[in-house]
Amino acid sequence: MRLIKRPSLFLFILVFCVSNYINSQNREPFKENWKSIEAVNQAPDWFKDAKFGIYAHWGPVSSAFEGADPDKWYAGWHGMKMYVDGKIVPQPNGKPSNNFVHHSKKYGHPKDFGYKHIIEQFETTGFDAKKWADLFAKSGAKFAGPVAMHHDNFAMWDSKATRWNSMNYGGIDPSAALKKEIEAKGLKFMGSFHHAFTWKYFAPAHAHGGIDPKDYDLYTNPHALDSDTPDAQFYEDWWAKLKEFIDVYQPDLIWFDWWLENMTEESRLKFLAYYYNKGLEWNKDVAVCYKETTFTETTAIKDYERGRPNQPKENPWLTDTSPGAWFYRPGAQFKSPNELVDILVDIVSKNGLMLLNVPPNPDGSIPQVMEDLLIDMGAWLNINGDAIYGTRPWIVFGEGPTRLPEGGHKVEDKVKIAYKNTDIRFTKKSDKEFFAIVMDKPENEIVIKTLSTEIGALNSRILKIELLGSNETIKWERTKKGLVIQSPKAFPTDYAHAFRIVLEGYTENNIGGDVGAHED
């Protein structure tokens, strides 16, 4: 092997850096209009390759139900629902919310013990950024980060834009600590923002009155319950916090929750142009995820909460989901690793990615059940990652009896899906390599009908088939009824099973130079 001499290596690095700098300078800055922003590569390759990310819902509101059976109480929305007394802030049934009842018993009337007092009790002794990042990496995630600001207007970083932050109340900067540890693991860093809804979130608090004007920087300025029009101060504060996080932490991805679609188009365009231009300045491809109609699929990445399309989409998309509640909830029921792996496989087959939530304990430690779940997912991905990471949709996404009856938000809540061993999902690595993922353990032979010699979906000869994680020789035959794979003696995992299908490659006949071949 010929070693590169030091001057040559230095010259190579110099040329590479200068080339990258020139390329970044040659790209036109984005302007605050849709036409300009549509020139962005809204789904960079790193995002399309990643397939799996993690964020964590943790903050002062996590302590609201500590030691209590929450039943149907809202956790993350406690700062809003705690003021719903059924009278001043009515409900259709005329009764107070479960949150109001619980809060009154635990803390006293919310007019006397408001949300700001919950913030003042924020406990962070269990938070360990290195442990979080180690676990995220073990799970197989390729990007991760905190919920930087939820509906409660509380900054999970050392903010100068708001005094309501984790350094002033908690003594830590989780965003800085997580960025350092997450990037040290080779993962991309993200932050999520939910504070567009803050205007509606704290409207019930204002209905009760008595808020000290000096605390309007938390609760927003007084406004009516039915107000959907934030004032100028709200827009100024919303942008200042978001801009500060971008400037200080240089995230690879910004994810937005709903209600941003109700803010002005001007404010949304201002963000997109600023953040994408920052990406040019940092010389890295950044990404934005959104819900509803906030942006367009040519300017950012569409997200589906606890849902997904029932067919593949041309543009990459994202599902944000949680194995249990979004925030800590005692006694919460969690999805199994098997369920989450199946959801991930179905998502990836349709050109999507999964953003999985982790709900830490109130003190910032991660529950053992969540840790076990993530390690199990990581073990599956360690074996089957070739069928997930860096793949693209095949010509069809799958076959089998189990399909989503509809696509969109919250379909996971509407329909209980249990995939069977006759459900197959496909992913593609290249023109000569794709994967058939069997969603449950086969009992006998596996028949993939899509690959029948009669259908014509596959226009290449199969060279070999392998089961990921196994050294066993796989026996197979392609017939009129489909690709028939004999079940191996043992499977390397307990969940979905990925078969690598290696192809000869598509070739076309050439006419050649024989004159006779060209005669009609």
In which residue ranges do the predicted regions lie?
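Mature catalytic domains of secreted/periplasmic carbohydrate-active enzymes
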Residues: 25-520
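Bacterial Sec-dependent N-terminal signal peptides
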Residues: 1-26
